[in-house]
Amino acid sequence: MTESRLLVALRPREEIRSVLGRQLPTIGWEYVSEGSPSRWKDVEAMLLGSVERELVGVNARALPHLRFVQRVYTGMDGVPFERFPDRVRFAGNVGGYAPFVAEHAVALALAAARELPRAHALAAAGKLRPPPVQRLLWKRTAVILGYGEIGRAIAARLAGFETRIVGLNRTGRAAPGCSEMFAADRLIDAVKEGDFVFDARPLTRATEGSIDASVLSAMKTTAVFINVGRAGTVREEALYQHLSSHPDFRAALDVWWHEDFASGRLEHQFPFADLPNLVGTPHSAGFGPDVEQYVLERAVANLARFFAGEEPRYVIQRSEYERP
């Protein structure tokens, strides 16, 4: 049997076999769950899914030729870098979920702005009036925190609403689709501009807890805050207290602080579900009938670059994620 050069740390399914067969036809590979460590001595790369489920029993430090890990998911928070040799480079699937997360972000923005849950409750009760207090995306200003692949996809979808786009990235360098761009160290200045504030940033040592009480207080009292990035960029208690004390402020969240994917449980430290100015979804922005195929193709395309001797895209700096 051909020695494996690629280790696939994902639940076995036909879609994976199909994509790998098309994009890496000459590369030997096997699943972690079905493979034999005795055939892993030539493994150079890993396709990584869930850290909690798929890395159980894998001793990455015992793989002498492992040099690259491509994650299926966008985020790299939670990856146990200490279990890998220092030589190993990591890449997230940046842009892999962008079309789907961006669509969900706009849906959340509209649900919160138009008070759709309250409107549904009125209709279900057979009432027409008084209607919920509705806000518009049309010709308003949206601030997008994290103007990467997801941020740009959100901006593109807001174009139809004639929304003015203000961005925030690391450097403040101008980018297409933005009328104004702020550097990351001007977070408070950026959020002051927004009728809508979208957070699409990764969770890194720099972004963790960056939206605190002072940043929330800098937002407009009637702003709508949408988070489709990582919950950890926001201080949980600060958001709860701000929503409680500012009834005209609204939030729409797809990401949460206490997500247990292994058990399928979502816990809350504060009673967010009781807040009338919050709309939430269960970290489901990346689900849909065409998502898996698109995501796999993007991730494997980057692996193909690696195996062809080219520089993979979206390689991260481990120091931005590793805990001191």
What role is predicted for each listed range?
Residues T171-Q269:
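Rossmann-like adenosine-cofactor binding region
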Residues K41-D42, H65, K192-E193, A218-T221, ...:
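Alpha-helix C-terminal capping/helix-to-coil transition sites in glycosyltransferase folds
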Residues T222, G229-P324:
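Rossmann-like dinucleotide-binding domain for NAD(H)/NADP(H)
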Residues E44-A123, P131:
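Phosphate/diphosphate ligand-binding glycine-rich loop within oxidoreductases
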Residues A119-A153, Y321:
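Glycine-rich NAD(P)-binding loop of Rossmann-like domains
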Residues V166:
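Conserved beta-strand positions in the Rossmann-like core of class I SAM-dependent methyltransferases
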